[in-house]
């Protein structure tokens, strides 16, 4: 069933990374977003180039999964690459969802594994990835406020 009043997120091949390929033959609907997944320590210029191609071709993109570690969820926390990604997303009005809000003992988790609170977290409860994410959200609050003030059902990138 087609839901014209709803936003539909469409995956792309190769773990939702081939948005450039999808942009060459997009589905002709106005309420679709194409999913992109990235992990900042693993996916760098090559995937950013694919995103830029998709945007140039007018494809509406939503990052439905990202982290600032390696794609495994472990390894280094790459804030430099993460900052580059956030700049690209913010400059192009692309929304995103971080993976993952948990206290699992892995680098991509936003909470430290020692955190047992279900809410009301202190800054020290956040993992290094979580501290970066929290600061990023606070530093870019004005961008998000502007985006929330002007929602649209037409998802096409302009």
Regions found by a protein language model. Name each.
Residues 1-95, 99-100, 108-139:
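Extracellular glycoside hydrolase catalytic/binding regions
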Residues 135-158:
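Non-catalytic accessory regions flanking glycosidase/transglycosidase catalytic cores in CAZymes
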């Amino acid at each position: 069933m087609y839901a014209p009043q709803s936003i539909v997120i469409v995956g792309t091949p190769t773990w939702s990374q081939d948005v450039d390929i999808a942009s060459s033959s997009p589905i002709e609907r106005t309420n679709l977003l194409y999913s992109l997944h990235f992990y900042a320590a693993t996916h760098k210029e090559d995937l950013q180039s694919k995103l830029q191609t998709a945007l140039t071709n007018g494809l509406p993109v939503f990052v439905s999964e990202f982290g600032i570690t390696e794609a495994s969820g472990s390894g280094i926390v790459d804030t430099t690459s993460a900052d580059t990604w956030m700049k690209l997303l913010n400059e192009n009005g692309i929304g995103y969802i971080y993976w993952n809000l948990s206290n699992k003992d892995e680098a991509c988790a936003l909470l430290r594994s020692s955190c047992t609170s279900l809410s009301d977290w202190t800054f020290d409860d956040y993992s290094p990835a979580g501290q970066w994410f929290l600061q990023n959200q606070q530093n870019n609050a004005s961008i998000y406020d502007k985006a929330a003030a002007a929602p649209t059902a037409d998802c096409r990138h302009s």
